[in-house]
């Protein structure tokens, strides 16, 4: 019992001491937590102040970069204390104050375009010029982008322990870009693109490996579309570098094996052809000559595939196997030239290669078109206007003017029917039997005059009109006795056609407009103006027989037509043949004909058309 009573008496004091110790430990823990919290808060405040200082420094650098005189060393030093976002702010702020966005450039911005995109006809691409508007040139845009990509993207307050980057600046003379390329879609690579010859040319050409920004350095744009004239047109392939796959590598190896086998076969074939060729047989030499030249290029180039393709392409171009001409014209013009060349060279087939019109053929076509046009234009009224009423005595007969003088041969000498043989006399008898008359006994009737034919035509028209009107019936006796003027008065008055509705008036106006564009350059040597010749020219054109086909000509053809008409009108204008004005004009025309690869005899043939009777 005693042993059990002692611990019971000590229990309350022990509990009190343990409670005191717990309270003391709690106070110490709270004190430590308060100290740690204040320390952490101080560290956090220091870190925030440090971040703020770095941000303030970056903002001050942005403000300094808005100035005009910025050196390369200062720009490189600033790159360590700013981020790409700060640099884009520099570009925006400089563009707002009308300065170039590149800090090293001191130029002012000119007229800023309002559009968002720009279409390049040279590279056939669409560029987004939203960022490009902030720069004065493509070089500044690319140099700015080149520097921006080197700026670290990490926060500025953690770069103290990092190694500063070595900034590089774009040098002058390197090309720039027009903006970011807008990718609408991406074409899938097909087997035809891989096997096409265009891909080989793209791989062989070292200039094609340059980036799109270097190819867009030229500021000038081409206003035309390149087109290919008849020939073997290569396929349009995608020249962008494609990733090398396993299948493509296998295809390349197979192609190399095939090329090596073809090379061995080519060597054997050439040796056989050389054995067959002999100096005494010209035909064999001619047959062996062309394939020998064609295949020698394949033997002499055992190098890479690119060199073999280039040499074979050059040899094929020389021998006309695959000749293609690149012309800077539009697609519509290319189709027009194809049709023109096809008409001028009807005998050339599809295998003729390059379409080339010889100067002789072009000259003959030009003279033929002008001769047909002037012949269709000429009327009886034209000859009366140029030479008066007695133009028959001035003009030549069509037979004497059109047919050249030929020398008489022995066969052309007339002979008697008996001496020429029975065959000729029999042929003449059969010819006389088929004719409605025989011999020259029949009297030749005189041709009616132009005035009588004109009067009869007017009377016939009058009779037809009166008959359909039903007003009166004219007998033949009365119509013959009446005068033409009185018959015209009996008809109802008719209003003339409106100029806009008359086809002849429209055609005459078109011809006058075309000639008015060409004549001022030809009237200088004659020292006369367009007003001095306009009345006579208009009266001459009114006598022409114009249609919807003979008034369509090229500028060169209109020039020659104007020269012909001017030569016809010089006597009417009072310019003497041997006057100083006419001599200068003749020299000018001779120079013009030389430029057109024509002769003065060709011009004489054209003017001779108006010196022959209809």
Curated annotation (Swiss-Prot):
Listed GO molecular functions?
protein serine/threonine phosphatase activity; RNA polymerase core enzyme binding; RNA polymerase II CTD heptapeptide repeat phosphatase activity; zinc ion binding
Q: To which species is this protein native? A: Mus musculus (Mouse)
- The kind of enzyme this is, by top-level EC class, is hydrolase
State the protein's name.
Answer: Putative RNA polymerase II subunit B1 CTD phosphatase Rpap2
Give the residue ranges for region: Disordered. Answer: 1-38, 200-266
Q: Which residues form a coiled coil?
A: 41-68
Q: Name one GO cellular component term.
A: cytoplasm
Keyword annotations: Acetylation, Coiled coil, Cytoplasm, Hydrolase, Metal-binding, Nucleus, Phosphoprotein, Protein phosphatase, Transcription, Transcription regulation, Zinc, Zinc-finger
Lineage per the UniProt record: Eukaryota, Metazoa, Chordata, Craniata, Vertebrata
